Amino acid sequence: MGRGRSEIKRIENPTQRQSTFYKRRDGLFKKARELAVLCDADLLLLLFSASGKLYHFLSPTVPSVREFVERYEATTHTKVWADIRQERRAELEKVGSMCDLLEKQLRFMTVDDGEEYTVPSLEALEHNLEAAMRKVRSEKDRKIGGEICYLQNIIRGRQEERYGLCDKIAHAQTLKDVECGSTSLSNGLDLKLGFN
């Protein structure tokens, strides 16, 4: 009696779907390993789970994924890595030009006595330094303003605490005065009425 074939459709139960994924993944990777060893085939298997986790297999005869993809590009006349390489090259050039510019500005900022500067370049340096000073002052003022607000809030909280304590003291004093007054009043009544 043969195994019953189930209809191939998406498994609705997430737990069962995950369990089936892991079992079938292991079977797929086992078959890939067997194919690579038995037939001496170069094989690259990439698998992403539903959660986005990557699983991969590369046959032992292939040195790296990059070489495998380059071989694929050469065989199929497509460019898998070309766009990525071009983007990276453009990014490197951009970063390199930014580094050159920053190094030039840094050298310019450190005025060397032995070096000759033109009046316009010195004016530009002065302008840059003034702009930097304005930025520093602005940031300092912002920080000081924040500290002042923080301290004012603490003072306000302490004053409210103080007012609350003063109210409690006044209320306690009033209760004490009322208590003392009622005691003396009751003593006075007792004396007058002769209940002592």
From Swiss-Prot:
Cellular compartments annotated: Nucleus
Protein name listed in UniProt: MADS-box transcription factor 32
Cited PANTHER family: SERUM RESPONSE FACTOR HOMOLOG
PROSITE patterns with a match to the protein in the record: K_BOX, MADS_BOX_1, MADS_BOX_2
Signal sequence range: none
Gene Ontology cellular component annotations, sorted alphabetically: nucleus
Coiled-coil blocks: none
InterPro entries: MADS-box/MEF2_TF, TF_Kbox, TF_MADSbox, TF_MADSbox_sf
UniProt gene name: MADS32
Top-level taxon in the UniProt lineage: Eukaryota
